[in-house]
Amino acid sequence: NLIENLYKDSREDSEIKEKFNNEIKSEIPILTEYKEVTHRPIEVFSKDYQTYCFKDFGIYIWRNEDEYFSIRCGLLGQNGVGGHSHYDQLAIECFTNRNWIARDPGTGTYTDNTELRNKFRSLGYHWGPRADIKFPNEDEFDCFRLNYMSDGEVLTYYKNGFLGYADFYGKRIYRKIEIENGIVTIEDYSK
């Protein structure tokens, strides 16, 4: 294989080879075969912005000194259990014109009220895909576990866009973000 022939000597070459092989193996689906939900465009950036990737934490950021946009897509944490995590894969946060347009509600409340805790960590309390998915009720033994959401997977991330997916109760949802002339468009795709 061409990549193996190009990068076969040093440890650094081996790491580069692995990176290229991973990129080649990433499959980007033909999204026109999926149901599409297009969200209202958001005017975010009035000037240039930088990108920041925190892959291990699963956060991808576009920002300048006044404006901010991010998406959560990554590992659940605690060896896949989720622990204190929420159902926030593919959820966004957005700050522009001195206002939060979309904001993660945070931990909400640590309480012995399981129903309230589950509400604060649900899809409905985050700015993620609005999927019509009915999760089973989780009891006090499930409060510190994410049973119905997978790790998020980023397929592409660059200055003007993002494409990633996560599975929610067995349903795969892709989220595509494009930024053009400071305007963010978000599209969700599922079968």
Question: What do these predicted ranges mean?
Answer:
Residues 95, 165-167, 187-190:
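Residue-level recognition of well-ordered beta-strand positions that form the cores
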Residues 113-116, 187-191:
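Acidic (Asp/Glu-rich), glycine- and aromatic
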Residues 101, 181-189:
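C-terminal catalytic subdomain
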Residues 52-66, 135-181:
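Extended, loop-rich substrate-binding clefts of extracytoplasmic carbohydrate-active enzymes
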Residues 1-101, 157-161:
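Carbohydrate-active enzyme catalytic cores, enriched for enzymes
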Residues 92, 162, 175, 186-187:
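Hydrophobic residues positioned within well-ordered beta-strands of beta-sheet architectures
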Residues 68-154:
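Catalytic core of carbohydrate-active enzymes
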